[in-house]
A protein has these predicted regions:
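FAD-binding subdomain of flavoenzyme oxidoreductases
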Residues: 38-192
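Glycine-rich N-terminal segment of FAD-binding domains in flavoprotein oxidoreductases
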Residues: 1-36
Length: 194
């Protein structure tokens, strides 16, 4: 195994990262996850979808959208990032106001640990059952294991979308309007100010 020889494995999703993680040192092994790109299971009753970690994010969203569902995770890199990459970087998306961040969507993870063991880390009933080990992998960028499968909680797709733009005289007025919207408990998926 790589661990027995002291060789670090660097998982590579679709290469949308900007932190230099795709440049392994000569003593490291780059593991291209790009061929692990399949929707493995779609449970429309329980609103769950299991993807291989290398699946393109936009293709994952399109696959569930064909069934009237949504992941609800729309990072700006959605078309060039992978589902496993979202978890590995603890990504946030443009619709996080409405749907949450990636950690809010993860139902379970399948991971290969550094010793080669394949484990599944899933949700457990809320109780004093110990730490939720999924959170160790979220944002770890492959340092604690290689994510091979991700099961995400889905939502029913909105029956319609409405887009609106408004003018504010200055930034302060715009921020005040956004604050009032949030404090009124409205949950627009996206709010931007330019």
């Amino acid at each position: 195994t790589a661990a027995a020889h002291g060789v670090a494995i660097v998982p590579f999703g679709l290469g949308s990262g900007v932190c230099g993680g795709i440049e392994p040192q000569s003593s490291q092994l780059l593991l291209d996850m790009g061929q692990m790109n399949t929707l493995l299971a779609l449970d429309e009753e329980n609103l769950l979808a299991t993807f291989e970690a290398g699946m393109n994010g936009l293709e994952a969203e399109q696959a569930v959208a064909a069934h009237g569902l949504t992941i609800g995770h729309w990072p700006q890199s959605i078309g060039i990032s992978s589902v496993g990459g979202w978890v590995s970087t603890r990504a946030s998306g443009q619709f996080s106001t409405a749907y949450g961040n990636i950690e809010d969507m993860i139902y379970s993870l399948q991971v290969v640990l550094p010793n080669g063991e394949l484990v599944t880390l899933g949700k457990a009933p809320r109780a004093a059952s110990g730490p939720d080990l999924r959170h160790l992998l979220m944002g770890a960028e492959g340092t604690l294991g290689v994510i091979t499968q991700v099961t995400l909680s889905l939502r029913r797709a909105a029956p319609c979308r409405r887009y609106s733009a408004y003018y504010a005289a200055d930034m302060a007025q715009g921020f005040n309007a956004q604050r009032q919207i949030v404090q009124a408990d409205w949950k627009p998926p996206v709010m931007r100010q330019y």
